[in-house]
UniProtKB/Swiss-Prot annotation:
Species of provenance: Bordetella pertussis (strain Tohama I / ATCC BAA-589 / NCTC 13251)
Cofactor note text: Binds 1 [4Fe-4S] cluster. The cluster is coordinated with 3 cysteines and an exchangeable S-adenosyl-L-methionine.
Residues that bind [4Fe-4S] cluster: 31, 46, 49
GO molecular function, one term: magnesium ion binding
Cofactor: [4Fe-4S] cluster; S-adenosyl-L-methionine; Mg(2+)
Designated name of the protein: 7-carboxy-7-deazaguanine synthase
Assigned EC number: 4.3.99.3
Gene: queE
UniProt domain Radical SAM core: residue ranges: 18-210
Length: 210
């Protein structure tokens, strides 16, 4: 299978339970909930999306003919340090492209594999860390994993709709944009009132890293 990658870069994970951890981010092109075109944003399941996932023209992006080639590019992006290799497959929606062949190839390079998914598609076996981020009314089929991270507030995706799912960690992440301060205040109060939930901030945006 060929893979279309918007961008490939090394940075620190900025969000959730793995915040602060060095990681290679492999951002796949494409999403099943929005085309990525501004003209279509109003009809998207997540009108608040702040990610460019269209095309393959980003840093380190491109079309990769097979799993081995993409795994080699991920390893090269990580660099010479052999320990604690960690790759995050994201998007767009990574489960449109992530398959068992690619998982096997990056595992063979010594990586722990994480995904950040909207949870609407079933994952292949072998993923080490599953983070689901529900979007609007889009039905979630991934009902167990390591981390559920909900952008908050969403009128069509309330925290109580997901609190019963089998995840180890539950995070509220204040929605970015002009009302971020108000959203943060709301998220803080919700976490205080519902201690099952923890606050996740996009620390990479605060410290100016990708």
């Amino acid at each position: 299978m060929a893979y279309s990658v918007k961008e490939l870069f090394k940075t620190l994970q900025g969000e959730g339970a793995q915040a602060g951890r060095a990681a290679v981010f492999c951002r796949f092109a494409g999403c099943n909930l929005w085309t990525g075109r501004e003209s279509d944003r109003a009809g998207a399941a997540c009108t608040f999306c702040d990610t460019d996932f269209v095309g393959t023209d980003g840093q380190g992006g491109g079309k990769f003919a097979d799993a081995a080639g993409l795994a080699d590019a991920i390893a090269a992006c990580w660099g010479e340090h052999p320990a604690d290799r960690y790759v995050v497959f994201t998007g767009g929606e990574p489960l449109l492209q992530l398959d068992e062949a690619l998982l096997q190839a990056v595992h063979a390079q010594g990586f722990t594999v994480a995904i950040e998914t909207n949870g609407t598609l079933p994952p292949p076996p072998g993923i080490d860390w599953i983070c689901v981020s529900p979007k609007g009314r889009a039905p979630v089929v991934v009902e167990r994993g390591h981390e559920l991270k909900l952008v908050f507030p969403q009128a069509d995706a309330r925290p109580e709709a997901f609190a019963h799912l089998a995840f180890e960690h539950f995070f509220l992440q204040p929605m970015d944009g002009p009302a971020r301060a108000a959203h943060t205040t709301q998220a803080v109060q919700y976490c205080l009132d519902h201690p099952q939930w923890r606050l996740s901030l996009q620390t990479h945006k605060y410290i100016g890293i990708p």
